[in-house]
């Protein structure tokens, strides 16, 4: 079962030491790579399934996603302002998706409830993530569209965001994998889908509002909400709870400041509209210095409450998930 370890300006260093020591002890059983699933092919299949395949009960317990990768863009110095990491599939997102949907340890996040605060003799109440009253907002989606076409089955709204140069391939991949959204009727202005849905259709499956929007962390500003994208503004006006998801976006020191500024702005927006907002940030553990700097900036400079999700499945992997 998962628990939350709140980090402060002192305990973060103990946490970093212990987590990277554990990572080193597991090195023999873990892949030693940067985390790209396969940079040699232009089309890749990602399967998301049960941890115990013998418990598979229906087609709803398995997802197979076909992803187009513009691998020539990964090595280009002229596309997307030379920011090219989003053009391939990274392993953090499939790992997180499988853990969240299928593992019993993640049920507290799926269904909500009280989760143990480690070393505090206390608990924190989490709202359910899997509910039609919940919206998911993904930062740094990349081109794959894995989270929208899987987690979209369990929520009322999903907004996938990235820099504008990424969005065309992201939209293509989502459209080609709509069959994975087998629990929902999808409506979307950005994808031009089912803008007029009749009531008889909604009797069979519930509605998912799914949008792909540009969101540049360095330019994101909430001072004038009338300038925000209408779909993003509607998310904050209409949903009781929003979970922000950001998978493998912390991989160098240059992105940390603008990312945390964006999280801070989103939290301010949530406060304005009385929305319960939590952020789940998945990190592949590469540079100890980058992970430390991220935690220092979040906890010390931005004075954010940062929790480490302590979980045996996560700790036997190369990934850490933090909640802000």
Swiss-Prot record:
Gene3D superfamilies membership: Vaccinia Virus protein VP39
Gene Ontology BP term (one): methylation
Protein keywords: Methyltransferase, S-adenosyl-L-methionine, Transferase
GO molecular function: S-adenosylmethionine-dependent methyltransferase activity
Coiled-coil segments on the chain, per record: none
Source taxon at top rank: Eukaryota
Family designation: Belongs to the class I-like SAM-binding methyltransferase superfamily. RKM5 family.
Protein name: Ribosomal lysine N-methyltransferase 5
Species of provenance: Vanderwaltozyma polyspora (strain ATCC 22028 / DSM 70294 / BCRC 21397 / CBS 2163 / NBRC 10782 / NRRL Y-8283 / UCD 57-17)
Record gene name: RKM5
């Amino acid at each position: 079962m998962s628990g939350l370890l709140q980090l402060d300006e002192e305990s973060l260093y103990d946490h970093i030491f212990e987590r990277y020591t554990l990572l080193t002890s597991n090195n023999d059983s873990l892949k030693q790579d940067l985390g790209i699933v396969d940079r040699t092919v232009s089309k890749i299949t990602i399967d998301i399934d049960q941890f115990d395949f013998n418990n598979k009960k229906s087609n709803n317990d398995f997802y197979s996603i076909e992803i187009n990768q513009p691998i020539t863009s990964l090595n280009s110095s002229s596309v997307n302002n030379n920011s090219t990491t989003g053009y391939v599939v990274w392993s953090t997102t499939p790992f997180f998706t499988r853990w969240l949907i299928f593992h019993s340890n993640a049920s507290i996040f799926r269904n909500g409830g009280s989760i143990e605060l480690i070393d505090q003799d206390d608990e924190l109440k989490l709202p359910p993530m899997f509910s039609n009253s919940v919206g998911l907002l993904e930062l740094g989606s990349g081109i794959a569209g894995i989270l929208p076409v899987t987690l979209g089955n369990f929520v009322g709204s999903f907004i996938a965001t990235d820099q504008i140069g990424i969005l065309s391939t992201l939209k293509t991949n989502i459209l080609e994998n709509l069959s994975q959204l087998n629990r929902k009727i999808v409506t979307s202005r950005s994808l031009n889908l089912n803008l007029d849905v009749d009531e008889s259709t909604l009797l069979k499956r519930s509605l998912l509002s799914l949008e792909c929007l540009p969101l540049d962390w360095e330019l994101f500003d909430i001072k004038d909400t009338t300038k925000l994208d209408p779909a993003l503004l509607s998310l904050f006006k209409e949903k009781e709870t929003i979970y922000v998801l950001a998978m493998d976006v912390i991989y160098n020191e240059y992105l940390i400041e603008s990312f945390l500024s964006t999280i801070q702005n989103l939290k301010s927006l949530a406060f304005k509209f009385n929305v319960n907002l939590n952020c789940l940030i998945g990190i592949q553990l590469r540079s100890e210095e980058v992970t430390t700097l991220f935690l220092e900036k979040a906890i010390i400079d931005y004075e954010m409450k940062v929790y480490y999700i302590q979980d045996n499945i996560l700790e036997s992997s190369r990934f850490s998930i933090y909640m802000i």
